[in-house]
Amino acid sequence: MELMARFLERYLHFAPTNTEPPGTLIWFLGHSYKIEDSQWPEKFLYDSFSLITITYRSGIEGLENMTSDTGWGCMIRSTQTLLANCLRICYPEKQLKEILALFADEPSAPFSIHQFVTMGKTLCDINPGQWFGPTTSCSCVARLSDQNPDVPLHVYVARNGNAIYRDQLSKVSFPVLLLIPTRLGIDSINESYYDQLLQVFEIRSFVGITGGRPRSAHYFYARQNQYFFYLDPHCTHFAHTTTQPASEETFHSATLRRVAIQDLDPCMIFGFLIRDEEEWHSFEANQKYFADIVQIFDSEPQPVETHDDFVLDENVEDHL
């Protein structure tokens, strides 16, 4: 509480004024704050600064031929940030240090940078020091979750881009984190997705977006009209380990940042936390508002079989 008070004091002293009219809503991970005047709502600031943010680290031991992830680890750090805040929402009774221990910069931590690097190489042939994309990041989270049953959160990654299959999900125990790695355009987000993307922030199960700009990932947690608020991992602190923990202050951001929707990169990961059957039914009911971003089907289509009868003889080309 004292740390958050210091952050608020620091921010309110330097804060730009809010330019949106009174009555405008800020949507923050499924709930809202109403703008009353030119100032940001204090509860919104407090909740923003209370979020866990995991950034670049230096002095890391155990990484192959390197001691820092600065310059290449932002997608991993932003994905860790999404996962850490998801766990905090799911288990509010857990102490912050318990959650941070899962992401410690040491090989034994379940979701450490070491584990992501190892899994990235195993699953996607991504070498240490190479940038992760959304699909690689999601695949790593799912596999690491499977390998750590003591972490009380299951992960389901959408298939075929953005598809959730009910029969597959029914085999996963709650609570479950749904991760949807997708692309909403070519060089920028296609305007046809704007309304649905804005709607996602109003869904109660929404736990954030990882993405941002090409090779510069962030964690997005709130929006005001078409501006998105985000946490930025591009700040380097010294490594956090269980024996030498970093200052708690390095896991919170004292700066409010936002970017316009048209400036976002179209590649991103959507995260939704489903804690029980009731929340799943609520998610299904609301999916119609962002049906082009997340699709739900009963089961995955069977692959089409190819028979020899349909294979052209190589000599046919001579007669065409």
UniProtKB/Swiss-Prot annotation:
Its EC number is 3.4.22.-. Signal peptide: none annotated. GO terms for cellular component: cytoplasm; cytosol; nucleus; phagophore assembly site. The active site is at residues 74, 232, 234. One of its GO terms (molecular function) is cysteine-type endopeptidase activity. Coiled coil: none annotated. InterPro entries: Papain-like_cys_pep_sf (IPR038765), Peptidase_C54 (IPR005078), Peptidase_C54_cat (IPR046792). Pfam families: Peptidase_C54. One of its GO terms (biological process) is autophagosome assembly. It is found in: Cytoplasm; Nucleus; Preautophagosomal structure. It catalyses: [protein]-C-terminal L-amino acid-glycyl-phosphatidylethanolamide + H2O = [protein]-C-terminal L-amino acid-glycine + a 1,2-diacyl-sn-glycero-3-phosphoethanolamine. Keywords: Autophagy, Cytoplasm, Hydrolase, Nucleus, Protease, Protein transport, Thiol protease, Transport, Ubl conjugation pathway. Disruption phenotype: Impairs atg8-processing. Transmembrane segments: none annotated. PANTHER family: CYSTEINE PROTEASE (PTHR22624:SF49), CYSTEINE PROTEASE ATG4 (PTHR22624). Cysteine protease that plays a key role in cytoplasm to vacuole transport (Cvt) and autophagy by mediating both proteolytic activation and delipidation of atg8. Required for selective autophagic degradation of the nucleus (nucleophagy) as well as for mitophagy which contributes to regulate mitochondrial quantity and quality by eliminating the mitochondria to a basal level to fulfill cellular energy requirements and preventing excess ROS production. The protease activity is required for proteolytic activation of atg8: cleaves the C-terminal amino acid of atg8 to reveal a C-terminal glycine. Belongs to the peptidase C54 family. This is Probable cysteine protease atg4. It comes from Schizosaccharomyces pombe (strain 972 / ATCC 24843) (Fission yeast).
